[in-house]
Amino acid sequence: MKTEVSKKLMRVIVFLSLITFGINASAQEYVAPTKPPETGRSPGVKVKLISDAGSTKTYVLIFAPGDEVMSGLKEFALKYHVKSAHFTAIGDAQRAKIGWYDRSKKMFKVINIDYPSEITSLIGDIAIFNGNPVVHGHINLAAEDGTVHGGHLLEAFISPTLEVMMTVEPVQLNKQMDTEFNLSLIDPGLEQ
């Protein structure tokens, strides 16, 4: 009888341990480097042309609360027929997903930032791959205590704002697939 009670008690302890600790023991999420961002998730973005120096144009893009960054940048590139651009930005994110490139898997390990953060730096470029504009961004996000996480930007939802300075160049830059790394990389000599 005492042994049966001990076995039942041990099962309950194991079960409760699995519930308590198993919630955080989920499988690591990975994403393919060539996965395009979803569009339609940035309805509040405002755009203004602030410089038109010949064929090079500079725009300011202001994101509203709730707008998703990669979606808004992709939509801008499509609407304005961007063939080559570079950008910088600062602002705030409510939450974000960044990626760290795992060479052994040839994929991005997803790092979730589930708390409000200062976007202390966002830089990137836009180039053409298979006829479509591809946004490539890297971001630094600072937590309340000043700790900074950075990596490849997968998604970031803005609150209260993001201020992007976007320079669009007239010469098309093209990307091609690097099969060794499973990445689409800019090739300045590639003409399409």
Locations of regions flagged by a protein language model:
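Bacterial N-terminal signal peptides
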Residues: 11-22
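N-terminal intrinsically disordered, cationic/polar leader segments
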Residues: 28-60, 64-67, 71-78, 84-88, ...
